[in-house]
Amino acid sequence: MKSMIAAILFALVATSLAGYLGYAGYGGPYGGYGAFGFRGVPVGRAVAYSSSIRHPGYGYGLGLGYGGLGYGLGYGGYGGYGLGYGYGGYGLGLGHGLGLGKVW
């Protein structure tokens, strides 16, 4: 149980790190969660992130799972985009986000 909770928290933190690009006029890119578990259940996550009132960042992710391996694509407002990937094991999925954005 502890390992499951730790893995979930890790996934949340990893995907949230990409959101820092939403700061000061960057788009808010987010990658979708990877597959959830060995069955590759598709998991998507909608995220709202804003670190600046004048230039809020936001994005959404779509997850696609297959055989425990999943990929996610995300697009963020104000020119940001991201890619997420994950490997599901022991009924859990870990996701990472990579984001790029442009200044307005």
UniProtKB/Swiss-Prot annotation:
One of its GO terms (cellular component) is extracellular region. Its main location: secreted. Belongs to the non-disulfide-bridged peptide (NDBP) superfamily. It is found in: Secreted. It comes from Lychas mucronatus (Chinese swimming scorpion). The keyword DNA repair does not apply. Expressed by the venom gland. Keywords: Secreted, Signal. The keyword Electron transport does not apply. This is Glycine-rich protein. It comes from the Eukaryota. Residues 1-18 form the signal peptide. Transmembrane segments: none annotated.
